[in-house]
Amino acid sequence: MLNMRKSHPLLKIINHSLIDLPAPSNISMWWNFGSLLGICLSLQIITGLFLAMHYTSDTLTAFSSVTHICRDVNYGWIIRYLHANGASMFFICLFLHVGRGMYYGSYNYLETWNIGVILLFTVMATAFMGYVLPWGQMSFWGATVITNLLSAIPYVGTSLVEWIWGGFSVDKATLTRFFAFHFILPFIITALVIVHLLFLHETGSNNPTGLNSNADKIPFHPYYTIKDMLGFIIMFLFLMILVLFSPDMLGDPDNYTPANPLNTPPHIKPEWYFLFAYAILRSIPNKLGGVLALILSILILILLPLLHTSAQRSLMFRPISQCLFWILVADLFTLTWIGGQPVEHPFIIIGQLASILYFLIILVLMPLAGILENKIMKV
């Protein structure tokens, strides 16, 4: 008789995805972030569900309800801070996961990569709407500034913004709909993750060399389940240190002041994981140009398969492209720093130079380096 996990209609799917899945024998810890993202998503959905039980999406009571969760609900403070800092862990894993895909040429799995980019946009939208819910100063003004960017769209812009707001300013209608979207989007993300995995399992995993590994595969369980467990432990360790010792380190102090439409904070800025895109947006004086640059800064990932000129898939044996990749990483750190700084000299010019360098490396220098490396290989 067949083993139940191999014969049962439901268990069979799980078995082929997590247990008997053939995996390359040489994948490194950089391949750990997919499963870490799954854990982060589960944590966010569970903590978010418990928060939603006590939260009220009304402008008069939203701020008080968050205070009530932290003060009066059993372990409400840890649920709230796990959710807030869990989002930061989610984005750290997400950026490392995308970086891994760029470094090792995983973008050549077109369907998997494109679904991944859609996932990135969806997660960013969800995080933005979640940031509005506590209804602090930065929540209110962040929502006002970011939604207002849509008014840069010619002809329909202003109507579109008012339609999203549900009125002539960010108010009760906006908060209610943002809460509804913030609640439903993680389930849409879960569905997209399943599609992402479905496409991945059509081709099998990439590996550090970028070569075909069909001749050398090992079962996912127990080898990579144990390896992933180590990643879970390290991530939870960092998350718990953050939550229990400095839960507000990554937040903004302005968000502990209730939203006040009559008083603008001196520096409006989003959460740290959006700062690189915010810096690119601010570096262009024109509103429409800034919005386009903001969208393109993420959408550029879709173009990576078209910009791949090298005969080799991975950067493992390509030193020139490696240098450019790490300059790009340093550039993203610079943009993140600039995004959190006030709009004044010298931050404006640094932001503009870093933004130009970001697009220049991806669109021009990396493809040229690929062509150059091909020529060197032939010599």
Swiss-Prot record:
Any single biological process term in GO: mitochondrial electron transport, ubiquinol to cytochrome c
Entry superkingdom: Eukaryota
Binding site for heme b b562: H83, H182
CDD domains with a match to the protein in the record: cytochrome_b_C, Cytochrome_b_N
UniProt keyword NAD present: no
Keyword Protein biosynthesis tagged: no
Annotated cofactor note: Binds 2 heme b groups non-covalently.
Other remarks on this protein: Heme 1 (or BL or b562) is low-potential and absorbs at about 562 nm, and heme 2 (or BH or b566) is high-potential and absorbs at about 566 nm.
Complex formation: The cytochrome bc1 complex contains 11 subunits: 3 respiratory subunits (MT-CYB, CYC1 and UQCRFS1), 2 core proteins (UQCRC1 and UQCRC2) and 6 low-molecular weight proteins (UQCRH/QCR6, UQCRB/QCR7, UQCRQ/QCR8, UQCR10/QCR9, UQCR11/QCR10 and a cleavage product of UQCRFS1). This cytochrome bc1 complex then forms a dimer.
Name of protein: Cytochrome b
Taxonomic source organism: Eospalax rothschildi (Rothschild's zokor)
UniProt lineage: Eukaryota, Metazoa, Chordata, Craniata, Vertebrata
Gene name as annotated: MT-CYB
